[in-house]
Amino acid sequence: MKITLSKRIGLLAFLLPCALALSTTVHAETNKLVIESGDSAQSRQHAAMEKEQWNDTRNLRRKVNKRTEKEWDKADAAFDNRDKCEQSANINAYWEPNTLRCLDRRTGRVITP
């Protein structure tokens, strides 16, 4: 595919005016300056959507935090109950780690130390 010099010059002669015509249309001059306050309908709608999403996730975050706090309180109470059970004057009291309860060795019933 040899392109002769005359074909290259002809192609260049054709493409150069086309490129110049396109470049002049691209660089149009304007004398107007548009200043937006940032308070457009689109930005208000976007802010409303973000607020709605935040509120939805806030409810979910509250549920997760309550569950975490509840589990923490349960573990904390079990730790305190274990200490009370182990320090109990009742010699038949023992701590059951699987159920997190203080049980009587003879009956297997829950006791309060």
From Swiss-Prot:
InterPro entries: DUF1283. The keyword Protein biosynthesis does not apply. Residues 1-28 form the signal peptide. Pfam families: DUF1283 (PF06932). Keywords: Signal. Belongs to the UPF0482 family. This is UPF0482 protein YnfB.
